[in-house]
Amino acid sequence: MSAHTGASYEGIAGKYAATVDSKPWNAYYERPAMLALFPSLVNAKVLDVGCGSGWYAEYLLSHGATVTAIDLNGEFVALTQARVGQRATVLQADLTNPLDFAAGGEYDAVICPLVMHYLRDWQPAFREFQRVLKPNGVLVFSTHHPFADWQDYNTENYFAVDLVEDEWDVGKVRFYRRPLTVISRDLDATGFCIERLLEPQPTEDFRLVHPEGYERLTKSPGFLVVRARKK
């Protein structure tokens, strides 16, 4: 079985990037929760993992951070580079391999928005995040909520790690679902302590643009957002 499903974005990255800045699940649900868990960004050195089309990289820069942004998909790397120019270092990198561009203890924070569910095994990536973080550094990441995936994809065993496929407006995407206990276990095993865990609520702006989605997310979780600190 493949270690990651990031190749799912090949051929659809441009279509995805065209809508992701304003898509309510991102703009009015996932991002507000991520931002609420960010540490102070002024003069912070931050690694943006899975930079996509560059929204987070641009936000981090505008709030005083020095940014390295990485993505597996070459088209996303080009889109982020075009968006931020020379203000950030933008690289193509695979989370199933060591992050050889980064020195140990280089970053104050690692952010990883809606990326981890494309990996079958989280521990190698978490170990690299732990390595590149400074002592007491912070990891903030978002992922699919375990209950939502178990409910939506009719998998028989909640406690299993399963490969599932979804049909988006821009095409088919594959990812892995897993139970909450595996998420907690993998963080602890790689030297992280969970500080905060959010099951986000959609903002009022979400309700205005997508009432049906808003109604669902106020009653059933979609994403999980975690802030963990290097032990």
Regions found by a protein language model. Name each.
Residues 100-110:
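A short acidic, Gly/Pro-enriched loop at the edge of an enzyme's catalytic core
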Residues 1-42, 55, 59, 76-79, 138-166, ...:
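Conserved class I S-adenosyl-L-methionine
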